Each structure stands twice: as C-alpha cells, then as structure tokens.
Amino acid sequence: MPTPSAPSPQPKGFRRAVSEQDAKQAEAVTSPRFIGRRQSLIEDARKEREAAAAAAAAAVASSEPGNPLEAVVFEERDGNAVLNLLFSLRGTKPSSLSRAVKVFETFEAKIHHLETRPAQRPLAGSPHLEYFVRFEVPSGDLAALLSSVRRVSDDVRSAREDKVPWFPRKVSELDKCHHLVTKFDPDLDLDHPGFSDQVYRQRRKLIAEIAFQYKHGEPIPHVEYTAEEIATWKEVYVTLKGLYATHACREHLEGFQLLERYCGYREDSIPQLEDVSRFLKERTGFQLRPVAGLLSARDFLASLAFRVFQCTQYIRHASSPMHSPEPDCCHELLGHVPMLADRTFAQFSQDIGLASLGASDEEIEKLSTVYWFTVEFGLCKQNGELKAYGAGLLSSYGELLHSLSEEPEVRAFDPDTAAVQPYQDQTYQPVYFVSESFNDAKDKLRNYASRIQRPFSVKFDPYTLAIDVLDSPHTIQRSLEGVQDELHTLAHALSAIS
C-alpha cells in the first residue's frame, strides 16, 4: 500500500512548531482547556490497587489480640472452621516451631498446608520469616486455639486466601465488563465542557444507553449524528489529517487510507461503529464494542485479550473540538482504529490484554502504564526518523506536534522501565518511549508478561473466541495438539511450493 510521499519534518522546538500554525490552531493547542487531559487507565488501576491494599492493611491492623475471633476470616464447613493463619516464631530456638505446632496437635486441627514466607513485618532480633498454615478445626475450639497460638508466637493474624481475580473466559462474558470510571461524566464534573449544556448532557445519556443495552453478538446500533456533531468531527478530522503525512507511522497511514476507502471515513460524515467493526474483523480479527465511557483498567484490558476494543460513540462538546477530557469517537476512530487494522500491532494489543487476565492489582497498574506509553503515546523508528503510533498522539493535534519536537525526552522502549515511569495527565508528556519496530515491542512485551506471577498461563482460541487456561498437563497437551495440527498444515504448504 503506497503512503503519501511528503517530506518528514526535522525535530524543532514546540513553540516554533505552534507558531507555524494558523491563529485558531495555535490558540487551541496552548489553551489551558486543551492542555488538560482525560483521566487515564493508570490512575484508575492505581486507585484499585490502593483500595485493595488499604482493605488488607485494615484487616491486619484489626486482628491484634483482644477477642480471639475479632476480625478473623474463616469459612464454616460442616461444623468446622477452615482458615489461613500467619504467625512469626517467638525467639530463635528450634523449639519455638515445635511449640507452635504442638498447639495444632492439641486441638486435633487438620493441617491442609504449611509453608514459610518472608515476613511482611519482620521483628527486631527475630528470623525474617513467617509461617502460613491453612487448617481445619471444630468451630467451638477456634477461639481457644487462637489464644494458645498467640501465647507461643508473635504477629498472629488471619489471612484471606490469595484468589485469582475474576476474568472473562469467553467473549460473551465481556457483557459483565462494564465498570465505568465516572470522574469526567458531564453530569458530575464541573470542569467538563458539557456540564452546563443540558442538551449535550441529554444527548450523551441517549447514546450511552446504546452501550448499556448492548449484548455480545448483536449488531452495533447506528447513531444519527447531528449537524453540530458532524461539524465538530470535521474540524478535528481536517486538522489532524493535515499532520498525518509527516507525523504518523506508515501503519497508521495505510490503515487510514483503507478506512477512507471502505468505511466511509471523510470529513462530512462520522463513521458507524458497526461498519468499522466489520472491516477490522476481516483485517485483523478485532471487533468494536460500544461503551458508555471510560472503563476500569481491568475490564478494558480484559477486552483486548479477546481482540475486542471498547469504543465510545459520543463526540466531544462543540465548544472544545481540539480536546476531550475523556475518550470519544474522535479519539477512538482517528487514533486507535487505523492502528488496529495492522496485524502486528493488533497482536501487540491483544498480548497486553492476555497478560492482564488474572493479574494482581499491582500488575494491572503496571500493564496500564505500559499501555499508556505504547498504545496511547508510543513512538517508533521508521527510515531513521521518529513517527507516532500512539492513539493519544494521533488524536491530539497539540501533543502530536510536541512529541516530535525537540522538547520531550525520548527513551528506548523497555517494558520494565515503562511500567514504573511516572506519567503526566495534566499537560503534555515530558517522556516518550520509542520502539525499534512493532515486532521488537511485541517480543519485549511477551518477555515481560512471562514474568507476571500467575498460577497458570492463558491462550486465546480464535475458533471459539474463548480463553484456554493452561493450568495442568492435560490442558497444555490439548493446546499442543492444536499447534501440531497448524504446523502440519504449514509443513504441507512448504512442501507443495518447494
């Protein structure tokens, strides 16, 4: 597919780049309203992690001595209490452990599991280890057993069993992934451009209802956009398209040309999600699904695992065409969709989603940060020059100029570094990560994902649109059989053409 043969710009200062635009564009780029940015997946993921950590800390703090059963978490099962207990030994003598174990023997507790772990709260002069025991004891003996353990051990507390967070196993279960972040809802946020516009707020509710009612397998309902909405789209479309030839990566340019040819991408009409979804399905297997706003990080990333991109249908307020505090269809259709039409980038996006399934809150926050610095704000090298591939850049006139100017710092993409890099959500990014190629980024991401601690691996089955959980020799063997069938087909094809 040929790409526009426009000369690539040399990096220049951001202010110089802005000064070369017309007055209206320059004002939009530098105005405070434009510089503010939508809430990110990272912020949502961090809030989820901090809330979970606070709940766990509160549970630990409330399990100090007093009432032996106060704040103890256990499961009732046929008259028995089943629980997890953590404790540290009192002193360093070998007999310390035997005294603790003797307590469980005295009460005839059935021990299911016993292990040592690094102590979360090591005590001075004590081994930096603690003991985890899962046991079962008659419910009537539980209080006495806990009191006895506390007499011979330190830092005794119950612990919830580490459970893998729920995640969808089949694509239809994405109907359950609808947790929205409401901070930038025009009904709730005083700073939202549409807060004082009752007509706009009512329009948003009408379009949001489409997403709330949508179920997997249904065609995405069409939206009849108003003249004002189309005018807003036109201003964004024309302004950004003028930069793509010199600032966007070749994959975005090729995808954008195809969308103009086959999906009705043009300045005087907003594409319908159903038409775009059908096009993507044929190109890379990705599908669109309507969403009413900004999804929680875990739900959004889980959707990517199924090659489903959650996409808004509403458009930003007419008073702020160059900026939206939340994702809207300009951001999705102009930034994300052309990139999802590329097979390698589509696989990269799905890999991030697969890595998120069953991951801890801490890992979700890190993956969201990797997503932020790649899929949203990533740069790549092409023909020795920097180009933009992140949707946050390709749908933001000001940041697209800024990212390829001399002002920001550019670092080589490394998932371990990007995962903990502080991000900027109030102005333009001071740091961007550049990938040598999408294949290189994909390989680095897979290496990073392989080190995420989960008691299983996952594999997407493209025939059933389901997630295979590889947690036993049997499930792995079954998956290998499918790979062997594919290899046989490829080997036959090679022999046929050689």
Curated annotation (Swiss-Prot):
GO cellular component: axon; cytoplasm; cytoplasmic side of plasma membrane; cytoplasmic vesicle; cytoplasmic vesicle membrane; dendrite; melanosome membrane; mitochondrion
Pathway where this protein functions: Catecholamine biosynthesis; dopamine biosynthesis; dopamine from L-tyrosine: step 1/2
Pfam families assigned to the protein according to its UniProt record, in alphabetical order: Biopterin_H (PF00351), TH_ACT (PF21417), TOH_N (PF12549)
Residues annotated for Fe cation binding in this entry: 331, 336, 376
Keyword Phosphoprotein appears in the UniProt entry: yes
InterPro entries given in the database record: ACT-like_dom_sf (IPR045865), ArAA_hydroxylase (IPR001273), ArAA_hydroxylase_Fe/CU_BS (IPR018301), ArAA_hydroxylase_sf (IPR036951), Aro-AA_hydroxylase_C_sf (IPR036329), Aromatic-AA_hydroxylase_C (IPR019774), Eu_TyrOH_cat (IPR041903), TH_ACT (IPR049321)
Cofactor(s) of this protein: Fe(2+)
Keyword Cell inner membrane applies: no
GO biological process per UniProt: aminergic neurotransmitter loading into synaptic vesicle; animal organ morphogenesis; catecholamine biosynthetic process; cellular response to alkaloid; cellular response to glucose stimulus; cellular response to growth factor stimulus; cellular response to manganese ion; cellular response to nicotine
Post-translational modification: Phosphorylated on Ser-19, Ser-31 and Ser-40 by several protein kinases with different site specificities. Phosphorylation at Ser-31 and Ser-40 leads to an increase of TH activity. Phosphorylation at Ser-40 activates the enzyme and also counteracts the feedback inhibition of TH by catecholamines. Phosphorylation of Ser-19 and Ser-31 triggers the proteasomal degradation of TH through the ubiquitin-proteasome pathway. Phosphorylation at Ser-31 facilitates transport of TH from the soma to the nerve terminals via the microtubule network.
Chief location of this protein within or outside the cell: cytoplasm
Single Gene Ontology MF annotation: dopamine binding
Subcellular location: Cytoplasm, Perinuclear region; Nucleus; Cell projection, Axon; Cytoplasm
Reaction(s) this enzyme catalyzes, per UniProt: (6R)-L-erythro-5,6,7,8-tetrahydrobiopterin + L-tyrosine + O2 = (4aS,6R)-4a-hydroxy-L-erythro-5,6,7,8-tetrahydrobiopterin + L-dopa
Residues flagged as site, Important for substrate specificity: 425
Biased composition annotated in UniProt, kind: Pro residues: 1-10
Outcome reported for the amino acid change (mutating residue 425 to V): Shifts substrate specificity from tyrosine to phenylalanine
Keywords for the protein's UniProt record, in alphabetical order: Catecholamine biosynthesis, Cell projection, Cytoplasm, Cytoplasmic vesicle, Iron, Metal-binding, Monooxygenase, Neurotransmitter biosynthesis, Nucleus, Oxidoreductase, Phosphoprotein, Synapse
Regulation: Inhibited in feedback fashion by the catecholamine neurotransmitters, especially by dopamine in competition with tetrahydrobiopterin. Phosphorylation of several Ser/Thr residues in the N-terminus regulates the catalytic activity. Ser-31 and Ser-40 are readily phosphorylated to activate the catalytic activity. A cysteine modification induced by N-ethylmaleimide (NEM), inhibits tyrosine 3-monooxygenase activity through the modification of the Cys-177.
Family, as annotated: Belongs to the biopterin-dependent aromatic amino acid hydroxylase family.
Subunit and partners: Homotetramer. Interacts (when phosphorylated at Ser-19) with YWHAG; one YWHAG dimer binds to one TH tetramer and this interaction may influence the phosphorylation and dephosphorylation of other sites. Interacts with NT5DC2; the interaction results in reduced phosphorylation and decreased catalytic activity of TH.
Summary of the function given for this chain in its UniProt record: Catalyzes the conversion of L-tyrosine to L-dihydroxyphenylalanine (L-Dopa), the rate-limiting step in the biosynthesis of catecholamines, dopamine, noradrenaline, and adrenaline. Uses tetrahydrobiopterin and molecular oxygen to convert tyrosine to L-Dopa. In addition to tyrosine, is able to catalyze the hydroxylation of phenylalanine and tryptophan but with lower specificity. Positively regulates the regression of retinal hyaloid vessels during postnatal development.
Protein's name in the database: Tyrosine 3-monooxygenase
Organism: Rattus norvegicus
Underlying gene: Th
